[in-house]
């Protein structure tokens, strides 16, 4: 479908399914009293008064999602990493082929905390001429500011005898990043966010107590805590410390420990809304189920734009119904197209790339064609 992208305002919405294989998703094997399987977010909401359970899950969350998200031990031949590389490479090539009348810019919105996009972009420096914009500015200390997204960069040559626009990939991390840290406190409140690409060596979190989120594992861990006062004390403030240390939206509905990030979150959402309201916009969705109610509402509202086209790549045949439910729709509007797997298979990252950059992929006619 690559031919559908030229000349358009291109936006991506990438969720946890893209990093699966290295970073776990928020699904779990936990069953509640009604015999319902819950996601991690649903467990934390339903068991909001169980402090031990909350701390056990947040400790697991730190070790399995946040700590792994730095990708310190990632090898360059890792398949997930190579898929991120291929995505960025193909997008850079697409922008290089755009005509001079079209801005050479693509926006990637992601709810993932990990550093896959950053590391993939870094690996392409020197191979391609492009600018990867993660919203930061600075040299020794890199700080975030929304105004950093509104840039155009040109190559002029030694004698300034021509202007050639450099392709820009904008990365919007809607739920924060493991690399973001609060700085410059005033009256015990931070007012800036900086980027640190490495985990603090003096981490204070104890070893993980469970291997997976399941009733059996959590019950065993809770019993261990009950019989060990020292361990109980060590784990007591896990959730509180994580909220303080990481600039993230954690897997609980409507949870903002810090108003600075709440403001930053809504600024990012407004940017998503603004991009989808532009003429001839495209939104390509992969690995995302629309469980975030704010994002779901923005995308639904954006469907009123008659020139917007949304392509949702569904991991499995069941994913289509899950997304319909999360969007609170009975059927998709005309400008949402779902791309389903063939032969009861799955659309993983590799197949997504093949379908996305395949010429003449059969999809229903676009709204504005």
Give the location of each predicted region.
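Short, charged/polar micro-motifs that form catalytic or ligand-binding hotspots
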Residues: 77, 103-111, 164, 259-262, ...
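A Trp-anchored, charged/polar loop motif used as the substrate-binding/catalytic surface
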Residues: 1, 86-94, 148-158, 260-271
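Alpha-helix boundary/N-cap detector
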Residues: 48, 52, 75-82, 108, ...
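Compositionally biased, low-complexity linear motifs
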Residues: 29-38, 125-133, 192-195, 279-282, ...
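Extended, H/D-rich, highly charged conserved domains that either
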Residues: 21, 100-250
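SIR2/sirtuin-family catalytic core signature
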Residues: 1-12, 18-20, 96-97, 217-236, ...
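Active-site-proximal helix-loop elements at catalytic-domain edges
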Residues: 69-76, 239-257
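Gly/serine-rich nucleotide phosphate-binding loop at the start of the catalytic core
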Residues: 1-135, 181
């Amino acid at each position: 479908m690559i031919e559908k992208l030229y000349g358009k305002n291109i936006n991506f919405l990438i969720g946890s399914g893209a990093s699966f294989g290295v970073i776990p998703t928020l699904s779990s094997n936990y069953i509640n009293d009604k015999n319902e399987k819950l996601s991690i977010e649903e467990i934390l909401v339903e068991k909001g008064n169980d402090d031990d359970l909350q701390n056990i899950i947040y400790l697991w969350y730190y070790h399995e999602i946040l700590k792994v998200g730095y990708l310190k031990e990632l090898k360059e031949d890792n398949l997930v990493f190579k898929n991120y590389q291929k995505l960025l490479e193909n997008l850079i090539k697409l922008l290089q082929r755009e005509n001079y009348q079209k801005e050479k810019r693509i926006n990637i919105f992601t709810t993932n905390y990990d550093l896959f996009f950053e590391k993939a972009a870094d690996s392409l420096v020197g191979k391609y001429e492009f600018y990867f914009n993660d919203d930061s500015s600075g040299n020794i200390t890199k700080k975030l500011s929304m105004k950093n997204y509104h840039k155009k960069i040109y190559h002029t040559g030694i004698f300034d005898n021509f202007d050639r626009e450099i392709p820009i990939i904008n990365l919007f991390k809607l739920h924060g990043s493991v690399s973001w840290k609060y700085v410059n406190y005033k009256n015990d409140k931070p007012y800036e966010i900086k980027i640190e690409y490495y985990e603090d060596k003096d981490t204070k979190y104890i070893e993980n107590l469970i291997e997976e989120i399941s009733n059996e594992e959590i019950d065993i861990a809770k019993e261990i805590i009950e019989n060990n006062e020292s361990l109980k004390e060590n784990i007591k403030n896990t959730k509180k410390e994580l909220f303080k240390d990481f600039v993230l939206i954690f897997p609980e509905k409507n949870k903002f420990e810090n108003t600075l990030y709440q403001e930053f979150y809504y600024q990012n959402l407004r940017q998503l809304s603004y991009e989808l309201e532009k003429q001839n916009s495209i939104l390509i969705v992969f690995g995302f189920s629309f469980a975030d109610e704010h994002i779901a509402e923005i995308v639904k509202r954006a469907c009123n734009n008659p020139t917007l086209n949304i392509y949702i790549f569904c991991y499995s045949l069941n994913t289509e119904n899950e997304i319909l439910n999360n969007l609170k729709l009975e059927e998709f509007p005309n400008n949402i197209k779902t791309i389903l797997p063939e032969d009861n298979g799955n659309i993983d990252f590799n197949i997504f790339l093949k379908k996305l950059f395949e010429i003449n992929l059969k999809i229903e006619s676009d709204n504005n064609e």
